[in-house]
Amino acid sequence: MKILLGNIFDSQCNTLVNTVNCVGVMGKGIALDFKNKYPRMFDEYQALCKSGRVKPGHPYLYRDLTGVSIINFPTKNNWRSPSKFSYISEGLKWFQQSYQALGITSVAFPPLGCGNGGLSWDDVGPEMYRALKDLPIEIEIYAPYGTPQEKLTFQYLEHAKTAHGALEGAKCIPFNDKWLLILEVVRQVNEQRYSLHVGRVIFQKICYVLTRSGIQTGFV
């Protein structure tokens, strides 16, 4: 097993893993890269989603006559939703039970549910390592860009305690239209010829003043 930083498409493994939702959308992140590189795979994926056959916890293998081998691994129901840790665990169990029958001899995984999914490598990395480390095939796991080297080691992944309380990724906060007023103030301040540009401290002061004046910014 190798824990790597880099581009999964540079892998020499026979099978690549793609993270997907269950509604037929590959609009950003690694899924968009897979869509652009393998349009036929995407067409099949959309058809399977429309028929309700793509479900969390149940990855599936796409393989064509040219040798392309891709596991589409659902980490969330809807593309708008965060990824769920339980879907990662269930999907890894599926892989443990299925890789041999599918003829998979080498496989490269992305950091499942991290990035746009909102899950943390500190949780996902150890879970992936423990689920895959004993399988007798070549396995590469690509960590998120910027992951410290010490968190790529087997020692870290073996002994890290997964925070099972973090069952799903970070949720998107509903947009508050009062934030547009904050942005307008920031814009006007930045356009002042002799004013300092807005940084963290000035931004906090703007939010404080607007909140104190009765604007429902949602900040306390």
Task: List each language-model region with its residue ranges.
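Macrodomain-like recognition of ADP-ribose-binding/processing modules
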Residues: 1-181, 188-204, 208-212, 216-220
